[in-house]
Amino acid sequence: AKWIKNPVSFASKQDVDIIVELIGGSENVAKKIVFSALKKGKHVITANKALMAKYGDELAYIAEKNNVNLEYEASVAGGVPIIRSIKEGLIANKINKIYGILNGTTNYILSTMEKTGKNFHDVLNKAKKMGFAESNPLADLNGSDAAAKIRILSSISFNRTISNNKILTEGIQNIN
């Protein structure tokens, strides 16, 4: 293994065909790496839902223009191939609505609270200990994680960009 001091310049290397970005975030080095790689004709694989929610349409355009693949299946629903299913399996169908549980942490917390009668903070702490919640679960709890996922899925399903202000977001951090 070799340590790369400047990951953005790594995308310019002739002997690199595919960049896998797992840094996360939409306004940091991850953004620079992905944009640079696509513009330099490199295929990109990312699990970065924040980046795809904010810049997905622009990144898809750059990828198409440079005849490279932009793969982001892991950015929504982890191991469930929902993006590929929508893009390939349901392409002939008209999608009118999207329903689903888009955040596993929220699902675990609410389900456990209902089943056990325990309070939010106790269940959240248990979720952290079990690895179901991040050490800083703010994006899960305030709804921004689910909003990013619905923005990505809506963009694909309805073939248009959905602005953040059109997505009603309500977190669970104040629930009892």
Where are these regions (language model features)?
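Oxidoreductase and adenylate-handling cofactor-binding alpha/beta cores
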Residues: I82-I95, T106-H121, A148-I162
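Rossmann-fold NAD(P)-binding glycine/threonine-rich loop
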Residues: I23-K40, A47-E88
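Hydrophobic beta-strand scaffold residues
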Residues: W3, V44, N69-L70, E134
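NAD(P)-dependent dehydrogenases' Rossmann-like dinucleotide-binding region
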Residues: I95-T106, L168
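Generic structural signal for well-ordered, non-membrane alpha-helical segments
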Residues: W3, M52, G56, G79, ...
